[in-house]
């Protein structure tokens, strides 16, 4: 029995977590559909289980990682040594007046739907973002001139000591695809959004318009992690990539989408190595042509 199998037994016995998998292929848990096995993947149902797992990992010196639904995650082919804590079962959501209070595993689509049902406006921009709340807040996700920082009020997080604290919007230091939560390695448990009362028909029309635009412009028929690169200041990554002659460029089954050059897609059987090689080709070509560095928006973890 290796140390991770022994640790999995401790998790089951001490923390009463039933959903624990050993050597679980991460390609089954990411939207890119690639990635080697993680030593332990567990899916807690409650805040206190997440807190207890984090504390136990720290005590036993076991590396741990946090994920939602894996829509912005690229796991390398060698997999992950340690524990992956998947938060998708933290999925409670409630409405109090103009506020939506949601656990970190709730999808942005479900929040958009809840807002619509309660005639709350401000969250329409996120209707097509495939991620869950925790990752979206951590990265200050955005689309169509909206972003999380415009609608968030507070977040309940686990800080590095294992203590649960509440951060207000200013303390989160939300910028373009960044936050103090990301910088400090905090884990989000719950988020409160503050929206405005609106007209249900107008909200629905806005959601339908954004969904139509997204379907027309993005390669949703293929596995991907959404926009692969962050937007360089004063430029658009997709235009730089296309102007570098890279639309349709492929490595194995990884391809710069012919529909939207800002997306690298998996056409079926790509490996993480294929995707990472293609990312490097894109970065090198754009740097050579425009003297601009492209940085990945997708989170890359694991071993080669």
Swiss-Prot record:
Coiled-coil annotation reads: none
Q: Which UniProt keywords apply?
A: Cell cycle, Cell division, Cell shape, Cell wall biogenesis/degradation, Cytoplasm, FAD, Flavoprotein, NADP, Oxidoreductase, Peptidoglycan synthesis
Keyword Calcium in the entry? The reply is no
Q: A Gene Ontology biological process annotation?
A: cell division
Reaction equation(s) it catalyzes: UDP-N-acetyl-alpha-D-muramate + NADP(+) = UDP-N-acetyl-3-O-(1-carboxyvinyl)-alpha-D-glucosamine + NADPH + H(+)
Residues of the active site are 177, 227, 297
Q: What cellular component GO annotations does this protein have?
A: cytosol
Q: A Gene Ontology MF term for this entry?
A: FAD binding
Task: Give the subcellular location.
Answer: Cytoplasm
| Required cofactor names | FAD
Pfam family of this protein, just one?
A: MurB_C
| UniProt superkingdom | Bacteria
Family under the similarity heading:
Belongs to the MurB family.
Classification via NCBIfam families? murB, PRK13905.1
Q: What does this protein do?
A: Cell wall formation.
The identity of this protein, by name, is UDP-N-acetylenolpyruvoylglucosamine reductase
The organism that produces this protein has a lineage beginning with: Bacteria, Bacillati, Bacillota, Clostridia, Eubacteriales
């Amino acid at each position: 029995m290796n140390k991770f199998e022994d640790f999995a037994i401790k998790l089951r016995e001490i923390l009463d977590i039933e959903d624990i998998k050993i050597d679980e292929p991460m390609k089954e848990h990411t939207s890119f559909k690639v990635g080697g096995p993680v030593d332990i993947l567990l899916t807690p149902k409650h805040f206190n289980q997440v807190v207890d797992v984090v504390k136990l990992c720290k005590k036993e010196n076991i590396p741990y990682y946090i994920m939602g639904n894996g829509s912005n995650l690229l796991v390398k082919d060698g997999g992950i040594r340690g524990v992956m804590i998947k938060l998708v079962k933290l999925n409670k959501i409630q409405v109090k007046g103009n506020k939506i209070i949601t656990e970190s595993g709730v999808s942005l689509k479900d929040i958009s739907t809840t807002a619509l049902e309660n005639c709350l406006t401000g969250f329409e921009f996120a209707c097509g973002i495939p991620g869950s709340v925790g990752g979206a807040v951590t990265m200050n996700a955005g689309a169509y001139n909206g972003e999380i920082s415009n609608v968030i009020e507070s977040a309940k997080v686990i800080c590095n000591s294992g203590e649960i604290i509440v951060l207000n919007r200013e303390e989160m230091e939300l910028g373009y695809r960044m936050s103090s939560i990301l910088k400090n390695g905090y884990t989000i448990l719950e988020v409160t959004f503050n929206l405005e009362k609106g007209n249900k028909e107008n909200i629905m029309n806005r959601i339908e318009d954004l969904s139509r635009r997204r379907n027309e412009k993005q390669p949703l028929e293929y596995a991907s992690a959404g926009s692969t690169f962050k937007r360089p200041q004063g430029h658009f990554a997709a235009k730089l990539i296309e102007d570098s002659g890279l639309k349709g460029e492929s490595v194995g089954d990884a391809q710069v989408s012919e529909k939207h050059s800002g997306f690298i897609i998996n056409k079926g059987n790509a490996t993480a190595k294929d995707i990472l090689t293609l990312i490097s080709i894109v970065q090198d070509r754009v740097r050579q042509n425009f003297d601009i560095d492209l940085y990945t928006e997708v989170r890359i973890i694991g071993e080669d």
